[in-house]
Amino acid sequence: GLQGAHGDWCVVLDYWPFLLGLLLVAGISFVDDIVSLPDSIRLVVQFVSYGMMFWNLGVFDLFGKYGWMIGLGTTILALIVVVGATNVINFMDGVNGITAAYSLSVLVPLFILNNSMPIPFVLNSLIGVVILGVLVFCLFNFRPKGKAKCFAGDVGSIGIAYIMLFMIGSLILVTGDLTYLILLLVYGIDGCLTICHRILLHENLGEAHRKHAYQLMANELKIGHVKVSSFYALLQLVISLGFIYLCPNTEIAHWSYLASTIIILTLAYILFMKKYYHLHEEYLASLKNKHNDSN
């Protein structure tokens, strides 16, 4: 028993940079939930937090392996990707249950992959504890509009993003396979294409909006929050399980599966927006008319 307890403490010590980074990024997000902080402060803390994660994952070993130029370039690019992904996951937290349901659709495939590998890429109990925590949160948040008892806030959505990106990052480094980013693809498509759409509209990306596909479903199409959240989670789960069980475990098969899925989801997003975005424009026009009438 004492030896087992000592082993558990060794595991905690092995993860301390990740845990410290999680505390930092969740802490600044909690403060931001209470009093709005400048974007610059939040971004600096996020970059520092992911620096701690990269230290834990051994990303900085690239400097010794490939030299300073390649190591620095790869690290900076990876930092931009993970900070961007974190904020996309935060932006997607706009209807009841979506963060909890989608997190489960990412964590379950990670658990399956972790148990199918000769050497686990992350502590199995870590995934289990996080899944348990998300399930408990579901009891209070995975409810129809107006019925939720609590919300994730920035601290919840950014905290779970940090944890999932740590696990996926560890998986990618162990396997050398970047295509495991497919585990976050549904959020990635909606988030990135909505950002591109807003850039084309010359909008301030820092301002709140309702232009994500899931927001159009919930607001303009009046689809229930639980249905929208379930759709996103099930779509991601089907894609991930297909990748794990149906896709041959070869480099060309993995990249082909990823590329074809990106193309299909991108086309689906564009067709959806072409058909329904006018409803959002009508909503914005009605707001403008109300504002003019009040003046």
Predicted regions span which residues?
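"…together with the soluble PPM/PP2C metallo-phosphatase catalytic core" -> "…together
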Residues: G1-G188
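N-terminal transmembrane signal-anchor/hairpin module of polytopic inner-membrane proteins
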Residues: G1-M69, T175-N295
